[in-house]
Every structure is written in structure tokens, then in C-alpha cells.
Amino acid sequence: MFSMVTEFMNYSQQTVRAARYIGQGFMITLSHASRLPVTIQYPYEKLITSERFRGRIHFEFDKCIACEVCVRVCPIDLPVVDWKLEKDIRKKRLLNYSIDFGICIFCGNCVEYCPTNCLSMTEEYELSTYDRHELNYNQIALGRLPMSIINDYTTRTILNLPMK
């Protein structure tokens, strides 16, 4: 008889403990119900990126001196710089510059260490394609500035997300 009472007491303690855990989880769920939604309807609404966002790299051909610092500081030796030495003026002339964004890790080292500031990060992050070879941008594609999200009339921009 005594063992039956202790088993019943253990069972009731376990039931109370389980109900308390369920109640704690339910209270957390209820606290989230009063918050504003964090998700956005992506193709129709876009977040404005922060000032230091590391998106697609923009390249200015006229500023580049073909020093290849960007290649040396890149952890994966990604930028391809083709140049020709002009013997009469003893300077390099840039022929081709390309970056494959299918491989790029967007670390920003090339932008940070460029001595002439011919590289900069843009706010463009929509680089998806069906063919990975389309992600290999030459100097012409890198020179195009992306369309600003703020000026895009087809989408609604959201300035900032609600804080927790």
C-alpha cells in the first residue's frame, strides 16, 4: 500500500513538472504573438541593405593600374587580371579584368586593399542564374551600377525591421 502511494506521488509530481514545462513553452509562444512579423514577401517587398553591406563588386576600369593587389589579398586568388607592359612608358596597361561570383566569398579584401579604389561593394545581392557561367563577370559587366532598390517602383521597400 505504501509503495502505491509513493508511485502516485511521483506520478503527480511528474505531471505537474510536465504541465509547468508546457506552460512555459506556451507563454513564450504567446509573447511572440504580440510582436510585429519579421518576414517579408520577398519579390514584392525588399529590405534596404545596410551601408556596409557586401554585395556585388563594382569595378572602374579607368582607375585600375593592374597592380594585382586584389589577386594577392584574395583568399581564393579569384580576380583574373590580364595586362600588357607598355615598354615605351614602362607601365602596365590593363587588358581584361574578371571575377567569377560563383566562387567569390564576398569577403571584401580586394575592395579594402585596392590602392586606387577602383573596386567597391554595391547593394546588389540578386545574382542567381540558371547557368553558373553567367556569374563570370568581365570588366564591362562589373562596371554597370545596379538599379537602386529605393528607385524601383515595382517593389515596396522596407526601411528597417522591427526590433525585438
From Swiss-Prot:
Location, primary (coarse class): plastid
4Fe-4S ferredoxin-type domain sequence ranges: 55-84, 95-124
Membrane topology: Peripheral membrane protein
EC top class, as a word: translocase
GO CC, any one term: chloroplast thylakoid membrane
Residues the record lists as binding [4Fe-4S] cluster 2: 74, 104, 107, 110
Cofactor note: Binds 2 [4Fe-4S] clusters per subunit.
Subunit structure: NDH is composed of at least 16 different subunits, 5 of which are encoded in the nucleus.
Protein name listed in UniProt: NAD(P)H-quinone oxidoreductase subunit I, chloroplastic
Source organism (scientific name): Daucus carota
